Structure formats: structure tokens, C-alpha cells
């Protein structure tokens, strides 16, 4: 009988845990933060919802390491730790868009983060800049493919001019 690799099983359970999350509201000790940058060694610099507070480091717990990833702009639920001087909290939950929606409905989502969540801002930019693809530089590693649509457009224009 073939047994799956322990890390694969662990990853499956973590993903299942995140998908079946009941969107439990944060406790009084926990706070919502946004990732500013990744510092390596499972440490991430985060900013809080209060603008006057300084950025600080949070650590990724062992259960998430090598299984879950966070990037700049992601939201986290962190819990403070006592023993750290520079590292002041540990990640307790990686927040998804569904968490953001639920927390906003509950009225606990911070105002500072409500203005432009990265995913919604990106969706708005896609709606506003429909010609975004025109700004891209062409890929010189592939042969240029001429589309038939352009030929049809020029054919219809020339036939309109003839009438």
C-alpha cells in the first residue's frame, strides 16, 4: 500500500482547515495587520491599522511553514507574544477575501485597510484600464501571430468606403 508523504498530508489538512473556516471573529488580544514585506526566516514585517504605531515583525508558526505563503499586501490575524523584542506577534490566521467580507459585515474591519484592499483595487484597475494589454512590451521570444480580426476590420472598412 502506498502512503502519501507526511508534508502532503499536512498541507491538505491546512488547506481544508482554511476552506472550512467558520470566520470566527478575532479575540481582544488578536489584531488585524497587513504584510509590508517578507524578511526571510519565516519573519514578516507588518503594519497595524493605527497609523501612528510602528511596523513590527511577526513570525510564521511551524504548522504554516513550507505549506502556506504570504506576500506583500496580504492580511493576517496575529496574536502578541511576550518573549520577543523585535518579533512582537505570531500569525494565527491568514485572512482571505471571504474573511475581509465577513469582518466588514461585522463592523470590525479597520478603516485604514478598508480603503483599498489589494484584490478589490486590482479588480477596479482591470475595469478602468481595459487597454492595459496595449501598454505591455511585445514578447520577442515568440513569433508574431497576425490575427484575422484585424483583416476583417480593414475589409469591412474598405467595403464601407466603396458604398
Swiss-Prot record:
Domain S1-like residue range list = 18-96
Do you know which InterPro entries this protein is assigned to? EIF1AD, NA-bd_OB-fold, RNA-binding_domain_S1_IF1, TIF_eIF-1A
The terms under GO molecular function for this entry are: RNA binding; translation initiation factor activity
Q: Which SUPFAM superfamilies match?
A: Nucleic acid-binding proteins
User: Residue ranges of region Disordered?
Assistant: 106-163
What GO cellular component term, any one, is given? Answer: nucleus
UniProt keywords (A-Z) are: RNA-binding
Which residue intervals are annotated with compositional bias (Acidic residues) in the record? 126-136, 146-163
PANTHER family for the chain: RNA-BINDING PROTEIN EIF1AD-RELATED, TRANSLATION INITIATION FACTOR-RELATED
Family per similarity comment = Belongs to the EIF1AD family.
Protein name (database record) = Probable RNA-binding protein EIF1AD
Amino acid at each position: 500500500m502506498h502512503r502519501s508523504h507526511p508534508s502532503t498530508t499536512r498541507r491538505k489538512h491546512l488547506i481544508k482547515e482554511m476552506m472550512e473556516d467558520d470566520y470566527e471573529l478575532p479575540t481582544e488580544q488578536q489584531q488585524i495587520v497587513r504584510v509590508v514585506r517578507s524578511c526571510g526566516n519565516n519573519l514578516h514585517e507588518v503594519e497595524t491599522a493605527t497609523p501612528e504605531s510602528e511596523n513590527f515583525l511577526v513570525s510564521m508558526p511551524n504548522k504554516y511553514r513550507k505549506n502556506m505563503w504570504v506576500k506583500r499586501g496580504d492580511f493576517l490575524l496575529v496574536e502578541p507574544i511576550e518573549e520577543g523584542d523585535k518579533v512582537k506577534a505570531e500569525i494565527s490566521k491568514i485572512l482571505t477575501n471571504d474573511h475581509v467580507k465577513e469582518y466588514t459585515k461585522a463592523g470590525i474591519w479597520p478603516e485604514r485597510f478598508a480603503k483599498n484592499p489589494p484584490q478589490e483595487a486590482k479588480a477596479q484597475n482591470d475595469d478602468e484600464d481595459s487597454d492595459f494589454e496595449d501598454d505591455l512590451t511585445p514578447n520577442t521570444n515568440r513569433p508574431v501571430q497576425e490575427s484575422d480580426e484585424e483583416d476583417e476590420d480593414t475589409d469591412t472598412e474598405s467595403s464601407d468606403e466603396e458604398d
